[in-house]
Regions:
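Sensor-1/coupling segment of RecA-like P-loop NTPase cores
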Residues: 160, 164-212, 218-222
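Conserved NTP-binding/hydrolysis module of P-loop NTPases
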Residues: 109-135
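Conserved P-loop NTPase "ATPase switch" module shared by AAA+ and STAND
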Residues: 127-179, 194, 463-468
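Walker A/P-loop nucleotide-binding motif
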Residues: 66-92
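Conserved small helical "lid"/interfacial subdomain of P-loop NTPases
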Residues: 209-258, 266
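N-terminal pre-P-loop "Q-motif" helix
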Residues: 25-32, 39-63
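C-terminal leucine-rich, beta-strand-based interaction scaffolds used for sensing/assembly
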Residues: 1-20, 29-34, 84-86, 100, ...
Length: 547
């Protein structure tokens, strides 16, 4: 407590992104939330000033016992920094001589509720030996509740974080009845005192409160850093990061959504160049986001709300207006939010994961829609992802004509490796094979058409700049092709057409078969094939119009 009392008394310091404050973590117990806080050996953590600190503190200062509001719900999307703001609030309230009962982690609270709360109470009454003795004598939660009830002459400030851990849908491994009991105990304990609760926006209780007029104040914290906060984050951490130009910084801001929790992974990477750091960042964010995101959608896919969900996801992906008739349970509030009647995703990785999910579900109509195609106009760093999805979805729906061959897609399948590709030899059947991983190194897709004893195989690469692109033809013929060729009957006529889809039509080129001599045998480098360069307009005129 001595360290807390030495903190800056100026509340504006906590709202100023130029300030990096070293704060003592305001919970004395052993089980601190080290998954969310980097706490050093002296018990301190760093807090970059956040503008929303002022909003939260101002709201708390409006509390009035008996004649006004006494409860505040703080909720929001994943990784905003709610927990750091609340811990800083706890420090400031302590510093201004208010008694704070700070409970930072309801997951840990549920393991041993009595000891966990007693630790918080010890700090609240650090300067009152008589009260410390009373707290020490509490043997169960009823004793704690009675103690708090008896403190009617002095208002306590209860700050309870991570309340989603007590939600019935949160998999904490704690019995549902125990969760309900803890919720009841917390409510009784904080009754007649000031009560600040925080949770992710997906919490069932929060979803109820968000859409009801209740007797509590509410603060929503969506997204990540604003422009000024992001600028100061770069200034503070530039020495610890690989060198980046402005475009690469914009790319990083897009993929992370400027979310503090996600930006933290960039600091962990320890990579010396941007490409490796970005790859690590993508890997870590995918691990954190993809499973919970798709699990939520999978549950809805089995209900009668699936079409609502798909339409709503399309609105989120394209930052459009929400559809009429949607409900609070039709989308995942951790990753998506609606503000001023407009739909938003929290970060680019969420957008990409949801786009890939709906793409694999066959909802190609989303990606040929002009609202999707126009997306990259406001965000050039994602134009490759947007246009690739639009091109491939357009081919799925309308086909493509190249080298006088019409590829009208009958079926599409997703592949992780060449082993997943099994060519159909049914007459006039065209199958479109699509890689599960976006930005697959060799190709973006592969068409296979069997017609009049000929198997037409057409690998596809989508790019804005063919000249600056890696040699996908060489990569395909050295990587995937040797694995595909043994699956093709020897007596079958094969025609290979490598399709480049880019800004403008180019000149078709007939490429002859090449070999390299290896000891006593010749090894094929590539078969005879045709290299075709076709413009976006031949796939979808809207793509060409908005590029």
């Amino acid at each position: 407590m001595e360290d807390i009392m030495k903190l800056d008394e100026d509340e504006s310091s906590y709202s100023n992104p130029k300030k990096i404050l070293s704060l003592p973590f305001p919970y004395p117990g052993q089980k601190k939330p080290i998954d969310r806080f980097v706490i050093n050996d002296d018990g301190f953590f760093n807090f970059m000033g956040r503008k929303e600190f002022k909003n939260v503190l101002t709201t708390i200062n409006k509390f009035r016992s008996g004649t006004g509001y006494m409860k505040l719900f703080v909720y929001g999307t994943v990784g905003y920094g709610k927990s750091h703001i609340l811990s800083a609030i706890a420090c400031f309230l302590f510093q201004t001589e208010r008694r704070v009962v700070y409970i930072p982690d309801c997951r840990q609270l549920s393991v041993d509720p009595v000891d966990y709360v007693k630790s918080a109470l010890f700090l609240a009454y650090h300067n009152d030996d008589a009260k410390i003795n009373e707290i020490n004598s509490c043997e169960n939660f009823e004793d704690i509740t009675n103690f708090c009830k008896s403190q009617f002459k002095e208002q306590l400030y209860f700050i309870v974080d991570q309340m989603n851990a007590l939600d019935e849908n949160d998999d904490t491994g704690v019995n549902l009845d125990i969760k309900k009991q803890i919720r009841r105990d917390l409510d009784k304990m904080a009754n007649n005192h000031y009560y600040i609760m925080s949770s992710s926006a997906n919490n069932k209780t929060m979803l109820h409160l968000m859409h009801k007029q209740t007797g509590e104040l509410k603060i929503k914290l969506f997204g990540g850093f604003d422009e000024e906060e992001m600028k100061e984050w770069w200034n503070s951490h530039n020495p610890d990061l690989p060198e980046m130009d402005e475009q690469q910084k914009k790319q990083t801001e897009d993929i992370t959504g400027r979310i503090p929790l996600f930006l933290k992974f960039l600091l962990e990477s320890n990579h010396e160049n941007f490409e490796d750091a970005l790859e690590y960042l993508n890997q870590q964010l995918t691990l954190k986001i993809k499973y919970p995101l798709t699990s939520f959608s999978n549950i809805i896919s089995e209900s009668n709300r699936w079409e609502f969900h798909v339409s709503l996801m399309s609105s989120f992906l394209t930052n459009n207006f929400p559809i009429l008739g949607h409900g609070p349970y039709d989308y995942d509030h951790r990753f998506f939010y609606i503000e001023d009647d407009k739909c938003y995703y929290v970060c680019g990785l969420v957008r990409n994961c949801m786009a890939d999910y709906l793409y694999e579900k066959g909802r190609m109509e989303i990606f040929v829609d002009v609202k999707w195609i126009k997306l990259f106009k406001n965000n050039p760093s994602v134009k490759g992802f947007i246009v690739e999805k639009a091109c491939l979805a357009s081919i799925c729906r309308s086909g493509i004509i190249v080298n006088k061959i019409t590829f009208k897609v009958n079926d599409y399948q997703f592949f992780s490796s060449a082993e997943d590709i099994n060519f159909s030899l049914s007459e006039a059947t065209c199958t479109f094979y699509l890689p599960r991983k976006w930005n697959q190194k060799s190709i973006d897709g592969l068409l296979a058409l069997y017609k009049t004893n000929t198997l037409y195989i057409a690998p596809i690469q989508v790019t804005f700049d063919k000249e600056g692109h890696s040699d996908s033809e060489a990569s395909f013929f050295s990587g995937i092709w040797p694995e595909l060729k043994p699956n093709i009957p020897n007596n079958l006529n094969i025609e290979v057409i490598f399709i480049w889809i880019t800004r403008k039509n180019g000149i078709d080129e007939e490429v002859e078969k090449k070999f390299k001599k290896l000891r006593s045998r010749n090894v094929e480098i590539n078969p005879d094939y045709t290299s075709v360069v076709t413009g976006f307009a031949n796939v979808n005129r809207d793509i060409d119009r908005y590029v």
